[in-house]
Swiss-Prot record:
It is found in: Cytoplasm, Cytosol. It comes from Schizosaccharomyces pombe (strain 972 / ATCC 24843) (Fission yeast). This is RQC trigger complex subunit RQT4 homolog. InterPro entries: TRIP4-like, TRIP4/RQT4_C2HC5_Znf. Keywords: Cytoplasm, Phosphoprotein. One of its GO terms (cellular component) is RQC-trigger complex. GO terms for biological process: positive regulation of DNA-templated transcription; rescue of stalled ribosome. GO terms for molecular function: zinc ion binding. Residues 65-98, 119-130 have a biased composition (Polar residues). Probably functions as part of the RQC trigger (RQT) complex that activates the ribosome quality control (RQC) pathway, a pathway that degrades nascent peptide chains during problematic translation. The lineage of its organism: Eukaryota, Fungi, Dikarya, Ascomycota, Taphrinomycotina. Component of the RQT (ribosome quality control trigger) complex. The modification Phosphoserine is found at residues 70, 380.
């Protein structure tokens, strides 16, 4: 068997005796006929001669094994139940060709009908292979059902963009590639990283995808240095020099392109400058009437602004409606004048006092009449009169011009303190702590905001 296979391999392939012996030994080590067929087709191709050789090889190689197993099959047939015998008979009758059973009558057959010429046998084998492939395609299209494993979302396979890696986009990439080639020339084998992924884990090295001596597939991790398996250089020194020259040429081309872009930008900027310069020159040669009118308008605007700065009078009034609902924002108005700030501070204090009074209520409960009366002290009308006077004074101040120092406080509009002499009479017993505070001298200090404070 081995000798016959070796002779046929030498007829089909132009190889020596040793390689033919290796091919036959690997083919004889295959277990099934399908695996042997795939092996021979991948090695010899799918021509008519190879298909005939594959069929003869499978008959000689695997026919003896089936015939050796026939006694055990016959023993097992005796133990089969009658129902199984009936099924076997039905299948046996159905397995005969169409000319064997015709009109429910059994006919004899000649042995010559089963003798096939080698050319016709090759055609039939090729037809059988194509029909088998068609049937396998049809069976693949039929889905048996939904499995639990089908419900799991498939992982998206990461596709390496080889087109982007082939492009050289910048000078930094070119310098990096040249540096990598120079380093790979001087690196030792002990310092290199060995990777046996065969390009399945890492992308292939584009410069040298495999070793020409041993055929090892080289990935990016291993680089361009010598092969880690056979120690032979993957790229010769001449090829490395050619790569470096090509990379330098590409770098010079990119530099020229960058310089051209820079020159085009300068030309466009010069054109824009000339266009603006021409427009400015055109504006000079206007009608004298238009120039006089524009100069007069500018002079009037200048006089108005200078007058505003000289008088520094307040001509606008801001009505803050939000302050009616939030009294705490009255004193923090940055746009208010010092007089308005002082008045806002007094208003805020009064509003806070009113809010505190509303919280404190006195309830009078009459058990006899079964009534509850809320006793709340009403604010005196004097406070409203004082507020009205302060507002009138403020409107008068707003109509006048401000002083040169806008931070100076307007103290004349605030209520003055009143001294009650009855406290010092002998009829009233005043504590010593209060007397000390009354007799103490107060010093007036002005803070940064222009507000007076007593110390």
């Amino acid at each position: 068997m081995e000798k016959w296979t070796k002779e046929n391999v030498l007829k089909i392939l132009p190889v020596d005796d040793e390689s033919a012996a290796m091919i036959t030994s690997t083919a004889l080590a295959v277990d099934s006929s399908e695996a042997a067929k795939d092996y021979w087709i991948s090695l010899l191709g799918d021509s008519a001669e190879t298909i005939e050789f594959i069929s003869d090889f499978n008959q000689k190689r695997f026919h003896s094994t089936h015939s050796g197993n026939s006694p055990s099959i016959m023993k097992n047939k005796k133990n089969v139940t009658p129902n199984n015998n009936i099924r076997q008979k039905n299948t046996a009758t159905s397995s005969h060709p169409s000319f064997y059973i015709a009109n429910n009558k059994q006919k004899g057959y000649d042995e010559e009908m089963y003798k096939v010429n080698p050319a016709s046998r090759n055609k039939s084998q090729s037809n059988n292979i194509s029909s088998h492939e068609k049937s396998s395609k049809t069976t693949k299209n039929v889905s048996p059902g939904v499995m639990t494993s089908d419900l799991i979302p498939e992982k998206k396979s990461v596709k390496h963009n080889n087109s982007s890696s082939n492009r050289i986009e910048g000078l930094a990439d070119i310098e990096k590639a040249i540096r990598q080639i120079e380093i790979s020339q001087n690196i030792n084998k002990a310092e290199r990283r060995v990777c046996n992924c065969q390009g399945r884990k890492h992308p292939l090295n584009e410069a040298a995808p495999n070793c020409l001596n041993c055929g090892k597939i080289i990935c990016i991790v291993e680089g361009i240095g010598p092969c880690t398996f056979c120690d032979n250089p993957v790229i010769s020194k001449a090829q490395q020099l050619e790569l470096i020259q090509e990379l330098k040429h590409e770098g010079s081309r990119l530099k020229q392109a960058a310089n051209q872009k820079r020159k085009s930008k300068t030309v466009s900027s010069k054109n824009n400058f000339q266009r603006l310069q021409n427009s400015s020159l055109h504006s000079i040669f206007l009608d004298p009437k238009q120039l006089e009118q524009k100069a007069q308008e500018a002079e009037e605007r200048k006089n108005v602004l200078l007058n505003f700065d000289r008088t520094s009078a307040q001509r606008t009034r801001i009505i803050d409606e939000a302050a009616d609902f939030d009294p705490t924002s009255l004193a923090s108005d940055t746009w208010a004048s010092p007089a308005e700030k002082a008045l806002n501070l007094v208003r805020m204090q009064k509003a806070m006092a009113k809010k505190e009074k509303k919280k404190k209520k006195v309830l009078s409960i009459s058990l006899s009449g079964k009534k509850v009366v809320v006793d709340q002290k009403e604010a005196s009308s004097e406070s409203s009169d004082e507020d009205q006077d302060e507002l009138d004074n403020l409107t008068k101040v707003e109509g006048q011009s401000h002083s040169h120092n806008p931070k100076a406080p307007v103290i004349r509009n605030l209520p003055r303190p009143i001294y009650h002499q009855d406290l010092h009479s002998s009829h009233v017993a005043v504590p010593e702590s209060i007397l000390n505070k009354i007799n103490q001298k107060w010093s007036k200090v002005q803070d940064d905001d222009g507000m007076p404070s007593m110390l």
